[in-house]
Amino acid sequence: TASWKSYKSGAHFANSCFVQIHPTCIPVTGDHQSKLTLMSESLRNDGRIWVPKKKEDAQAIANGTKTALDIAEDDRDYYLERRYPAFGNLVPRDVASRASKERCDAGYGVNKTGQAVFLDFSAAINRLGKDAVEARYGNLFQMYEKITAENPYVMPMKIYPAIHYTMGGVWVDYNLQTTVPGLFAAGEANFSDHGANRLGASALMQGLADGYFVLPYTISNYLADDITTGEISTDHSAFEQSEKNVKERLDFFMNNKGSKTVDHFHKRLGKVMWEKCGMSRSKEGLEEALAEIKAIREEFWKEVKVPGVQNSLNQELEKAGRVADFIELGELMCHDALSREESCGGHFREEHQTPEGEALRNDKDYSYVSAWKYKGENQTPELVKEHLKFENIELKQRSYK
């Protein structure tokens, strides 16, 4: 990816540990699936999230001897409404996601994998009528039924959290320039707008703000002194070296006599990241993840096999280059998460939580942007701290109770 090439060329990469989890996704049914299907967060406006209060009921639903309709109202745990009475089912995504994970980890999951909770629209249908609910969510209900073969107007949806968005990216200054002079990063490629949690409508916001309001002025200003500079020759040694590196990489992928597909390594990496650098992280888990990713990287470069030819459209070749970058990005995310000894926004460390299981921030020691500098192959990156300054607002922690 361009972002990763920028990082390896000297641009700092910032806040990679802050990852947004989307709580409203259709669960996977087994290891054969690599992704969860994203539903809209608008569903939580009217849907109520719950699991059975009794583990035996959850187990009965999971094995098919009961359904959600068999669980009496008094035997349902609307856990977001219970834990967060002020916000209920409308708590932020990271809070809702962790609460769902906690219930499922405790044994109250309602599908065969144990990783699903109910999103129930029966109260909304009774209150508003089916036609009103269909007018709001009909396309989403149709998509859900097509995937699961269950009618969400009758049977509560099953949902589970999934990775959705990364708040981190290439570090940029106020002018959107990276630490490499003359290299600018715009839109979701940079880190600049979000902090520890994602702001809404970010693609539209960053695309418009960076591309329409900022870059036309900052790049023009940067290039103003070079307005009379002539055409740059591509005979420069930097061009030759870059072209040589790309050709060598492509030749390697096409000629390597490995025995495993790119997808094999991609799936292994994803499993490690989800289990040990996902919704919940720990020192032990992150250190294990770093060791496992190192092993995946070493095996990838020995055993990856890319079919097809080089000089025509080859999606497997394109994918191989991306997964090679993903492996290194996964390592950086683990380093960042390991270094941040607090729970904040999309980053939750199990060692740093309140007695009620909520995120425990450490503003005194970690109120900074974590910008990482590439130090070379197989070398631990260098952490560069950009301390945050709050001039017009006071730094506070929100409560959703």
Positions of predicted regions on the chain:
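A glycine-rich phosphate-binding loop feature that marks nucleotide/adenosyl-phosphate handling sites
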Residues: I21-T29, K158-T166, I227-R249, G346-E358
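An anion/pyrophosphate-binding glycine-rich loop and adjacent beta-alpha core
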Residues: H12-K146, Y217-S220
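A conserved FAD-binding loop/helix module that cradles the flavin
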Residues: T1-S9, V180, S192-T218
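Long, amphipathic alpha-helical stalk/connector segments used for oligomerization, subunit docking
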Residues: N221-S312
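FAD-binding beta-loop-beta segment adjacent to the flavin cofactor pocket
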Residues: I163-A185, A189-N190
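Short beta-alpha connecting loops at secondary-structure transitions
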Residues: Q33-K35, H194-L204, L250-M254, W274
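C-terminal amphipathic alpha-helical interaction region
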Residues: E299-K401
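Conserved phosphate/anionic-ligand binding catalytic regions in large, soluble enzymes, centered on
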Residues: D77, F191, L204-F213, A337-H352
